[in-house]
Amino acid sequence: MSEPAPPLESALLVPVPEAEPCVQKHRFRHDSVALLGVPAHITVLYPFMTPDEISDSATAAVERVLEHFPEFPFLLTRLEHFPEGATYLAPEPAAPFVDLTMAIAERFPEYPPYGGAHADVIPHLTVAQTPDAPADELAEIERHLPIRCVAREAWLMVEDDKGRWHTRTRFALARSARA
């Protein structure tokens, strides 16, 4: 008897289209989710509900939380490395992303950030999942820094039964005179 397939996943994220020209080819080589349809992004909450658990009321609850957050500018200023080996671009300021994550996690306490694996929320845009990204590729990314960005929306993305990711719902952040 074969083992059952792992449950499908979902995630809430802030897409960062301004970073795509700089990081896309590197993410395609070193971040497996990039080839599965996940754009350059900063995670708000992962893992979230399985796709079949996402109801209209859950989507409305996410929208009610996010509607209180204004869009905001940020910079991707430097490459950093997690101890586990992933390389990422750090956003400045990081606080608005932490605030988004904490507000969603407070509303959905059964889905802690990163499944509760980490004590702190460290906003990041992953460029490589493994520590073996070549130094010349990282230097190429660094030449484009800082990257000016604006967080305008959050996306609820879901995985399908083939492992590909699709945007299910887009949530606009409130318009802001600052952004």
Predicted segment positions?
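Short beta-strand segments and strand-loop junctions that repeat across beta-rich extracellular domains
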Residues: 152-162
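Flexible glycine/acidic-rich beta-alpha junction loops that bind and position SAM and/or redox cofactors
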Residues: 80-84, 159
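Basic, often amphipathic N-terminal segments
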Residues: 1-73, 81, 94-153, 167-179
